[in-house]
Amino acid sequence: MNTKLTVLCFLGIVTIVSCGWMSEKKVQGILDKKLPEGIIRNAAKAIVHKMAKNQFGCFANVDVKGDCKRHCKAEDKEGICHGTKCKCGVPISYL
């Protein structure tokens, strides 16, 4: 039960950071205070950092909401998600 609650709280924090309601720096500070030094803290901080960099709704090379395509329409280019970043007219080289 405790593990499930911890995971649920962490996912909530990641959501708050990715939406921009709280700064990444503030969440990183909270993680530094609450988690012991080690692999768990480093993994949690890495996940928060990656999610905070989310741009135009891109997640794991998928344009979840179509924001990347809409963003690149202004340039008359195709919007392609590269991880969590949106790039206009730049195909993914490793596919």
Curated annotation (Swiss-Prot):
Keyword terms: Antibiotic, Antimicrobial, Cytolysis, Disulfide bond, Fungicide, Ion channel impairing toxin, Potassium channel impairing toxin, Secreted, Signal, Toxin, Voltage-gated potassium channel impairing toxin
Cysteine disulfide partners in this protein: 58-81, 68-86, 72-88
Signal peptide (UniProt feature, chain positions): 1-19
Gene Ontology process terms (BP): defense response to bacterium; defense response to fungus; killing of cells of another organism
Top-level taxonomic group: Eukaryota
Family the UniProt entry places it in: Belongs to the long chain scorpion toxin family. Class 3 subfamily.
Official protein name in the record: Hge-scorpine
Source species taxonomy: Eukaryota, Metazoa, Ecdysozoa, Arthropoda, Chelicerata
